[in-house]
Amino acid sequence: MVKIGINEFGRIGRLAFRRIYEL
């Protein structure tokens, strides 16, 4: 459960963080 959450967040989080950082 924790591994999947981190894996999913790492992929989606990285994309979301890049968009927010660009703003």
From Swiss-Prot:
SUPFAM superfamilies: NAD(P)-binding Rossmann-fold domains (SSF51735)
Catalytic activity entry: thymidine + phosphate = 2-deoxy-alpha-D-ribose 1-phosphate + thymine
Positions of transmembrane segments: none
Presence of keyword Cytoplasm: no
Documented EC number(s): 2.4.2.4
UniProt cross-references to InterPro entries, sorted A to Z: NAD(P)-bd_dom_sf
Keywords: Glycosyltransferase, Transferase
Top-tier EC class: transferase
Assembly and oligomerization: Homodimer.
Physiological role: The enzymes which catalyze the reversible phosphorolysis of pyrimidine nucleosides are involved in the degradation of these compounds and in their utilization as carbon and energy sources, or in the rescue of pyrimidine bases for nucleotide synthesis.
Family, per entry: Belongs to the thymidine/pyrimidine-nucleoside phosphorylase family.
Name of the protein in question: Thymidine phosphorylase
Taxonomic source organism: Lacticaseibacillus rhamnosus
Taxonomic classification: Bacteria, Bacillati, Bacillota, Bacilli, Lactobacillales
